[in-house]
C-alpha cells in the first residue's frame, strides 16, 4: 500500500513486514537478518512495531518483549520449545534495528504504530505512554527520524468520527 505513495520510476519499495510479528519475533525468525543483508547505503528503512509486542513473553504466542526502552534483559524458559531465551526491552530491539541500518549507511525512519479502533468519550485512544513513547525514545537515542503516525492517524480518524473510522479496520467476526 505504501508503494502507491511513491514514484516507482525513481525508487523501489520492498515491504518486508510480516503480520503478527513483534520486534522480538521479527529478529528471532531471521527476518531482520534478511533486511540487514540487503541494505545499501542511502536506503530508507521504515521501522514500525508495537501492535503485536504486548502479551505473553514465554507462553502462548510468546512474542512480547520486556516493557520499556532501557537496556534490561531477562532469561525466560520458553514453554513451546523448552529452551531458555534472553529477552530484551521493546526499545532495545528498535535500537538494534536502527543502529544496524545506520551501520550499513541506510536511513532509518521510525514510526509509532497506528491506533487501534478503541474510543472513549469521542476520542480514539492514543499510545503515548508505552509503545509510542518507547518508539520515540529509541529514535531520539539513536538520532533516527521519527514520525508519530499514532498521533497523525488518530487526529485524522477523530475528524472522521467513530462510524466512518470503522471502515479502516478489519472485522474479526469471521476470523
Question: How should these model regions be labeled?
Answer:
Residues 95-129:
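Active-site segments of SGNH/GDSL-like serine hydrolases
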Amino acid at each position: 500500500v505504501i508503494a502507491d505513495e511513491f514514484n516507482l520510476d525513481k525508487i523501489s519499495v520492498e515491504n518486508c513486514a510480516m503480520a503478527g510479528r513483534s520486534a522480538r519475533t521479527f529478529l528471532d525468525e531471521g527476518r531482520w537478518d534478511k533486511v540487514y543483508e540487503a541494505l545499501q547505503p542511502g536506503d530508507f528503512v521504515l521501522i514500525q512495531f508495537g501492535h503485536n509486542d504486548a502479551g505473553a513473553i514465554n507462553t502462548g504466542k510468546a512474542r512480547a518483549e520486556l516493557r520499556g526502552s532501557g537496556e534490561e534483559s531477562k532469561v525466560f524458559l520458553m514453554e513451546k520449545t523448552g529452551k531458555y531465551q534472553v529477552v530484551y526491552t521493546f526499545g532495545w530491539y528498535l535500537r538494534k534495528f536502527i543502529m544496524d541500518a545506520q551501520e550499513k549507511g541506510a536511513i532509518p525512519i521510525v514510526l509509532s504504530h497506528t491506533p487501534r479502533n478503541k474510543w472513549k468519550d469521542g476520542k480514539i485512544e492514543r499510545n503515548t505512554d508505552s509503545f509510542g513513547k518507547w518508539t520515540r525514545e529509541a529514535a531520539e537515542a539513536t538520532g533516527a527520524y521519527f514520525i508519530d503516525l499514532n498521533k497523525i492517524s488518530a487526529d485524522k480518524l477523530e475528524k472522521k468520527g467513530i462510524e466512518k473510522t470503522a471502515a479502516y479496520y478489519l472485522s474479526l467476526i469471521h476470523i
